[in-house]
């Protein structure tokens, strides 16, 4: 086992898993509480394309550089993580963005009860797209966690006794 390759792989895995987990469950909730709605939305709109690209591509990079045999466990966990990132990037992100734009447009056109009625439908749709996005983000994190467990086990088996 090449020490440089293994070290680089572990550092990359740590960066991806730690970054995804930290942003999802620490930084983003804090930003939501601290920033104004428009500021938070602008921040997320800038971050999420890169965030989901990282979620989609990094499991592929990990698979190509794995210092352990990619048996069913580690390979399937990386596939789950990558497919989750791809789903967020190519389906849920555009859907959520479209709904947010529709909400902005009706807010410019309507007021009062008419706005409330039209916005209620879009809020429900946003809730669906956002909820699914959270679910796929969680499945990415779980896939990466499962890969980390497999990686640890595989590396521990290679340590001379």
Swiss-Prot record:
GO CC list: mitochondrial outer membrane; mitochondrion
UniProt keyword terms in alphabetical order: Membrane, Mitochondrion, Mitochondrion outer membrane, Transmembrane, Transmembrane helix
Chief location: mitochondrion
Membrane topology of this protein: Multi-pass membrane protein
Compartment(s): Mitochondrion outer membrane
Superkingdom of source: Eukaryota
Bilayer-crossing regions: 10-30, 60-80, 131-151
Keyword ATP-binding tagged: no
Family matches, as PANTHER family: LATE EMBRYOGENESIS ABUNDANT PLANTS LEA-RELATED, LD23009P
The protein's name in its UniProt record: Uncharacterized mitochondrial outer membrane protein YPR098C
